[in-house]
């Protein structure tokens, strides 16, 4: 199969950045993947000339010089110092975008491809710099690592672009089991150095955020492309900020707690009367709702000793978590 133009140009840049000296056109033809496809020297020369012009048009500093004092042949290389970018000031959104691209490039699939290209150059006798002195691309220190999430991040981004629903295992915390979620994805956002998927949770029929580090690796697109509609004017960053905020949203939950148990919830709430439920004496408390996911997790942790009376959305969320712990589906 013929090598694509983009792949050939990338191979050429890797080769010319990695070589210590100048590479002759003959060495490039024999060792850089994509040029051996040329059937004749003339065809190679035309292709190589076009590629050199394209690199220069892209602003890549291609240098021409003698191979050595003993070999006056003309060769080529890319000066790393001239190739490197000057310091760049990025906005938080720009830094996040660069971090995504950088960490996708650092994924095992692309690392393997890059190392494979360098090994082929070595095998062809090209004198290149050691593997421990690579060209470095730095990401923003304010953006958390995606390590462990790179594989499925590309699937999520593809699904967002094609407006397709996804299915994946998710756990709200490491102490809880994974449950399968069906989501219409709207976008990926960073907040407080963490990565979140925002979308419509089909199982809960509500807008939800999902921290990428808590998504299992088995992410798969489901349903037809084009089926997902992102609401007009939706503010993904605001959704994430509200979901992870510790401040009160102004909403209140009413929760029944059995006497003598669920002490942490009792201390966090305000007494709102006594009530007997399921044959057990208890107390009704009112709790401010900051993050509904966090509150649902806290309440579910007390099992049958805490029961949500209202709102319905919080009660449903707690029931889903309890059923997941019990290993049963929705009833």
Swiss-Prot record:
Protein name: Protein PafB
The WYL domain, residue ranges: 145-225
Recorded family membership: Belongs to the PafB family.
Function: Does not seem to be involved in pupylation or substrate degradation.
InterPro entries given in the database record: CBASS_pafABC_assoc_protein, WYL_dom
Quaternary structure, from the entry: Interacts with PafC; with which it probably forms a heterocomplex.
């Amino acid at each position: 199969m013929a090598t694509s133009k983009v792949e050939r140009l990338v191979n050429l840049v890797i080769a010319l950045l990695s070589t210590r000296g100048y590479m002759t056109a003959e060495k490039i033809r024999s060792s850089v993947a994509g040029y051996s496809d040329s059937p004749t020297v003339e065809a190679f020369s035309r292709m190589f000339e076009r590629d050199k012009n394209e690199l220069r048009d892209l602003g890549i500093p291609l240098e021409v010089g003698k191979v050595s004092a003993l070999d006056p042949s003309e060769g080529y290389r890319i000066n790393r110092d001239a190739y490197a970018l000057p310091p760049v000031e990025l906005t938080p959104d720009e830094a996040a975008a660069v971090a995504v691209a950088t960490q996708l490039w650092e994924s095992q699939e692309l690392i393997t491809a890059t190392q494979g290209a360098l090994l082929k150059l070595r095998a062809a006798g090209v004198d290149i710099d050691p593997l421990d002195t690579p060209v470095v691309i730095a990401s923003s220190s304010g953006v958390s690592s995606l390590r462990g999430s790179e594989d499925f991040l590309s699937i999520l981004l593809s699904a967002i672009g094609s407006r397709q629903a996804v299915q994946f295992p998710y756990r709200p915390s490491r102490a809880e089991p994974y449950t399968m979620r069906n989501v219409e994805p709207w976008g990926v956002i960073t907040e407080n150095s963490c990565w979140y998927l925002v979308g419509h949770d089909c199982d809960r029929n509500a807008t939800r955020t999902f921290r990428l580090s808590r998504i299992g690796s088995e992410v798969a697109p489901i349903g037809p492309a084009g089926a997902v509609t992102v609401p007009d004017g939706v503010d993904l960053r605001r959704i994430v900020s509200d979901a992870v905020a510790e401040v009160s949203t102004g909403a209140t939950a009413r929760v029944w707690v059995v006497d003598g148990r669920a002490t942490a919830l009792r201390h966090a709430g305000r007494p709102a009367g006594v009530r007997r439920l399921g044959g057990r004496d208890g107390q009704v408390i009112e709790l401010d709702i900051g993050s509904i996911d966090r509150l649902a997790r806290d309440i579910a942790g007390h099992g049958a000793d805490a029961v949500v009376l209202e709102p319905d959305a919080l009660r449903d969320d707690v029931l889903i978590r309890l059923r997941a712990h019990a290993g049963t589906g929705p009833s």
